[in-house]
Amino acid sequence: MTKYFKKIIFFLILIIPTNLNASFFKDVTSIISDNPKRLSYGVSVTDVNQDGNFDFIVTGFGYLNLALSYENGKLINIVNQEKFSDEFRRTIGVAACDLDRDGYEEIYFLNTDTYSGTKKYSDRLIDLKGEKFIDLFEIKKNQKDLNLTAGRSVVCVDRNGDGKYGVYVANYGGPTRFYEYSDDVIVDKSVQLNLAKITGGRAVVAGHIISNNIDIFAANERGPNFLYKNKDGKFLDVANEYRVEDVLQNGRGTALSDIYYRGRLDILNGNWGGFHRAYVLKNKIFEDIAKPPFDEPSRIRTIISADFDNDGFDEIFMNNIGEQNKLFKILENGVIEQIPLDIALEKNGYGTGAAVADIDNDGVLELLISHGESFDQPLSLYKAKIASNRKYLRVKPLNKYGAPARGATVTLISNLRKHSKTIDAGSGYLCQMEPIAHYGIREKEKNIKIQIKWTNGKTEKYSVRDLNQTITIKQK
C-alpha cells in the first residue's frame, strides 16, 4: 500500500506544474520611503540631479511632482524646489531629453487643469542650472508660443538626426505643438513641420517605425490615429496608407516592440474600452495580429514592453484603471501568451501611469505604477522573481553631445534572434521609460553582437564579450 501511494504522489508531481502558484512579480513597494495616497499620473526616468544615476519622476495632479532616487536601499524624493514640485499646475504628462545640447536632459511637464481646449496654466520645461531648477518657459524670450491647450502625452523627437531634440505635445481639443530651440529661443514649429492638427490627442511614440529617420505614431481619441513619416525633418501623415488610423477606437497606451524578434520595431496600441492592437509591418502595411485574450477590451492606460524576468522574451504589461492589470509574454512567431498575475494584479487599482528602470542596478527591471484620477492611492513598485542563473545585457547609447540617444534603436543579434528595442523617447501613455535597451539572455544563446541605429539612420555594430553588464556607447 505504501508503494502504491508513493507512486501516486510521484505521478502527481510529474503532472502538476511546479509554477502553478508561483508569482511572476514580487512586491517591493516598501522601499519607497514616503508613499502617501495621492493623485499621480505620468512617470518618466532620467538623471534628475546629474549624478550619473537614473531616477523616477512621478507627476502629481494637485500633488507634488516627485524625483525618486535610489539611495541606501530606498527610493527617496530628492527635489523640493517649487518650479519642479509645482503641486498647483496639475501635471499629467512628462518626458525628458536634451534640447539645448549640453549633454543633460531637460524635463517637459505637461500641465492640464481642464479636460479639453483652453487651460489656465502653461506647461513647464525644467532645466537644472547649478543646484537650481528653472522653468525655461518663464524666460521672457520663450513665452511667445506657450501651450495653453489641454494635453496628455509628450515625446522627444530628434527629427534631423543631429542630436537636436524637439518635444511633440499631444493636445486635446487644440493643435499639436512641437517645441524646439531656434536661435536660442524656444519656439513652436508644429505648423512648418505639418504637425499642427487638432484632435483628441492621447498617446504618442517616436522612433524608427517606417523609415531610417525618427517617425511619430500618435494614438488619438474621437478621431483617426496619426503616423508621421519623417522626410528630411518634416512630417507626412501616412496612417491611412499604412492602415493604422483605427478611427472607431479611442487610443491609449502605446509602445514600440519587436513582436517577431526580426530586427525591426512594430506597434503595440491599447484602446480605451476597445480592441487592443499588435501592429506588425508586412508588405508596407501594418497588420493587426492581436488575438484574444490580448486584444480583449479593457480600461487601458499604460502599455509597456520589456523583459522583466530576463529570459530573453519580452513581456507586455497592461496597466488598467479600475480593473485588474494583465501580463503577456511575446513568444516566437508573434504568439502572445497570457501570464497569470496575482502580485501586481491590482484589481482595485486606479493605475494612471507606469515606467520601468533598473533603479537599483542589479540587472532586473523595476516596474513603478502610479495611481489616481478618481481615487487617491499610493505608488506601487514590483520586480520579477527570477532564477539566479539568468543573465542580462544592458545597452546605453549616448549621442554625440553625451545625452541619452532617445529614439535610437538597439538590436541584439545572436544565434537565436535578431531583437530590436527602442531607446525610449516617450511611450506607454503620459510616460517615458529608462533610455537603456535591457535584454535578458536566452538559454543556449551565443555569438552575441549589438547593432545601434542612431537617430540619423546610420548603424554601428559591436561585439559583446561579457554579459551581466551595462555597455555605454557614445556616438562618433
Would you name each region that the model predicts?
Residues 1-9:
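Bacterial N-terminal signal peptides that target proteins for export
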Residues 9-19:
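Bacterial N-terminal signal peptides
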Residues 22-38, 69-89, 126-149, 179-199, ...:
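Blade-edge motifs of beta-propeller repeat domains
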Residues 30-34, 286, 334-476:
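Gly/Ser/Thr/Pro-enriched helix-cap/hinge segments flanking short amphipathic alpha-helices
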Residues 31-63:
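Beta-strand-rich domains and repeat architectures in extracellular enzymes and scaffolds
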Residues 40-50, 91-101, 106, 151-161, ...:
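Beta-propeller blade termini
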Residues 50-59, 101-110, 161-170, 211-219, ...:
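Acidic/hydrophobic-patterned starts of short beta strands in beta-sheet-rich repeat architectures
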Residues 62-63, 116-121, 170-174, 220-223, ...:
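Short, solvent-exposed loop/turn segments at conserved positions within beta-propeller repeat blades
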